[in-house]
Amino acid sequence: MALGAAPAAQLALLALLGTLLPGPGGAGISIHPSKAIIPRGDSLTVNCSNSCDQKSTFGLETVLIKEEVGRGDNWKVFQLRDVQEDIELFCYSNCHKEQTIASMNLTVYWFPEHVELAPLPLWQPVGEELNLSCLVSGGAPRAHLSVVLLRGEEELGRQPVGKGEPAKVMFTVQSRREDHGTNFSCRWELDLRSQGLELFQNTSAPRKLQTYVLPSIDPHLEVPPIVEVGSRWPVNCTLDGLFPASDAKVYLVLGDQKLESNITYDGDSVLAKAWMEENEEGTHSLKCSVTLGEVSRRTQENVTVYSFPLPTLTLSPPEVSEWTTVTVECVTRDGAVVKLNGTSAVPPGPRAQLKLNASASDHRSNFSCSAALEIAGQVVHKHQTLELHVLYGPRLDQRDCPGNWTWQEGSEQTLKCEAQGNPIPKLNCSRKGDGASLPIGDLRPVRREVAGTYLCRATSARGRVTREVVLNVLHGQNILDIVIPVVAVTLILGALGTAGYVYNYQRKIQKYELQKARKAQEEAALKLNAQSTPP
């Protein structure tokens, strides 16, 4: 790695290298580093170490600007500044009237100042060879400098950069159709990885290559094979590979009628867009013609125009009371078949029917009918959907209006109570006793004043239902009412436990003392009997 301006740590390292060289008895000079590569204009620190066993003169010999930045008895450190070109450096020593030298090669690298791809021909025939020139000005060392020819991001070739200013590097490629509009460029690469550095590179401004081709294929016509009477359908006609595409003329004709087209150009492609509308059933011919110069390419497609109205879907009646029989029927044109959701497998035909006993769960249910007609080998589908409305009375259940709420005072809560029914019932919840309203639907802090039992009434034209809702609010006082008895019971149980423990302990002590006294009496009696027995 190239050495720059020497910091204190680097100077210390160079000084250490000097102390490690052979001591008295030998004569010689060494240089460190033994080789280096640095950017042009950069600085380098060099150490000259002398192993002479007597006082001698030594130093660094160079034409470069140098500055001594450190020294010892047998070493000196020099700083070279503003190095512009490759050079060989010498450390010398005059010892015992003999001069010894040590040398190193200092390599300077710098980037090319300019790289350019020479101008391309205005038009390039497809299939012919194309000569491209990359011009490189400056850059060193040339032994590590090369040029790469790029097609977009693809690498086509690589060659070393020779001498000369600017250096000219030639490449030959065969132009292709897909090269039209492609950017070509030159990239120089200065590869100093073998020197402990990295790969440096830069790319020239791209030049776009224009290739000339007249295709022998017919235009591509995009049109639906079947269209409905009275509808408007997009038609696209494209042809790739034209140049210059802007000179191409495109015509779209339906039967004998020329369609108004919107023509756009993109590179070597031309695209014509038009809207097709036909009110007469039958098979019609659509033609696309692309003309460039005196040569034309034509294509033709047949379009079948059909009539297929939506199926007729009826609910009889569309709005019913709960538990009323509803008839669902779907009808389409002859030749088509219908499918009504909810019906079991029935023979396909133009008519389908379903009967059901409507319940509240059927309210707002969708009934769908699908009709299918085969036209020119393709199946066309039409769909119709209706919604059933079921009238039923108010309902208040646990899911939509829970009967019991217990919340902590001050917490943010939303009380939900919703009545079901069609028509939508009017809901009123008032507290027993004072008639206060239940705060439904809003997120708000819970206050103890809202606690109580509420009676919720849902009313509509189809009846009325009621439901009782209890709202409990936990607050400081009722928590104490719970905690104090619990603590009291705990203390009483603790006292009883302690008393029982003391009582049992005292009983065990008394029993132990009694057993001890009894044993002493028995031992005394045995001793007395032994003394009274004659020998």
From Swiss-Prot:
Residues 504-535 are cytoplasmic. GO terms for cellular component: plasma membrane. Residues 41-102, 127-193, 230-295, 323-376, 410-463 form the Ig-like C2-type domain. It is a single-pass type I membrane protein. Monoubiquitinated, which is promoted by MARCH9 and leads to endocytosis. InterPro entries: ICAM, ICAM1_3_5_D2, ICAM_N, ICAM_VCAM, ICAM_VCAM_N, Ig-like_dom, Ig-like_dom_sf, Ig-like_fold. The keyword Phosphoprotein applies. Keywords: Cell adhesion, Disulfide bond, Glycoprotein, Immunoglobulin domain, Membrane, Phosphoprotein, Repeat, Signal, Transmembrane, Transmembrane helix, Ubl conjugation. Residues 1-27 form the signal peptide. GO terms for molecular function: integrin binding. GO terms for biological process: cell adhesion; cell-cell adhesion. SMART domains: IG. It holds the Pfam family ICAM_N. It is found in: Membrane. The chain crosses the membrane at residues 481-503. Residues 28-480 are extracellular. Disulfide bonds join C48-C91, C52-C95, C134-C186, C237-C288, C330-C369, C401-C417, C417-C456, C429-C456. Belongs to the immunoglobulin superfamily. ICAM family. ICAM proteins are ligands for the leukocyte adhesion protein LFA-1 (integrin alpha-L/beta-2). During leukocyte trans-endothelial migration, ICAM1 engagement promotes the assembly of endothelial apical cups through ARHGEF26/SGEF and RHOG activation. This is Intercellular adhesion molecule 1. It comes from Bos taurus (Bovine). The gene is ICAM1.
